[in-house]
Amino acid sequence: MTETVNSARATARFVRVSPMKARRVIDLVRGKSVEDALAILKYAPQAASEDVAKVVASAAANAENNFGLDPRTLVISEAYADEGPTMRRFRPRAQGRAFHIRKRSSHITVVVESQKGSAQ
């Protein structure tokens, strides 16, 4: 029984960007080809686009090196950002008060899938 694998995944954990901001960038590239997604992310003004681009490139490299898939046929089938641990900090304020600061982190996951007809 030989099973053909046509998808690969990559995950970046503990990325220091809030999940809400990461999801905003991920929504730009979900469903696009890997080449298009990397081009979009290269010029996206959001700070999280660099981290998402690294995960997309890593998923494409995993597909090519581990499963022998053609990188030109890869499409982002799944992409999501889950919440990671939150670092809690204090900001000293006037008259002995302190404000809470929550430094959020994300776990970014991208799954790429080979679409046979999308090679041009």
UniProtKB/Swiss-Prot annotation:
Care to name a GO molecular-function term for this sequence?
A: structural constituent of ribosome
Q: Which UniProt keywords apply?
A: Ribonucleoprotein, Ribosomal protein, RNA-binding, rRNA-binding
CC terms in the record's Gene Ontology section: cytosolic large ribosomal subunit
Asked whether the UniProt record includes Glycoprotein among its keywords, one would answer no
The biological process GO terms on file are:
translation
The record's InterPro entries line, in alphabetical order, gives:
Ribosomal_uL22, Ribosomal_uL22_bac/chlpt-type, Ribosomal_uL22_bac/org-type, Ribosomal_uL22_CS, Ribosomal_uL22_sf
Q: What family is this protein classified in? A: Belongs to the universal ribosomal protein uL22 family.
Per the entry, what this protein does is: This protein binds specifically to 23S rRNA; its binding is stimulated by other ribosomal proteins, e.g. L4, L17, and L20. It is important during the early stages of 50S assembly. It makes multiple contacts with different domains of the 23S rRNA in the assembled 50S subunit and ribosome. The globular domain of the protein is located near the polypeptide exit tunnel on the outside of the subunit, while an extended beta-hairpin is found that lines the wall of the exit tunnel in the center of the 70S ribosome.
NCBIfam families recorded: rplV_bact
Recorded hits in PANTHER family, A to Z, give: CHLOROPLAST 50S RIBOSOMAL PROTEIN L22-RELATED, LARGE RIBOSOMAL SUBUNIT PROTEIN UL22M
HAMAP family the UniProt entry points to = Ribosomal_uL22_B
Please describe the quaternary structure of this protein. Part of the 50S ribosomal subunit.
> What is the designated name of this protein?
Large ribosomal subunit protein uL22
Gene designation per UniProt: rplV
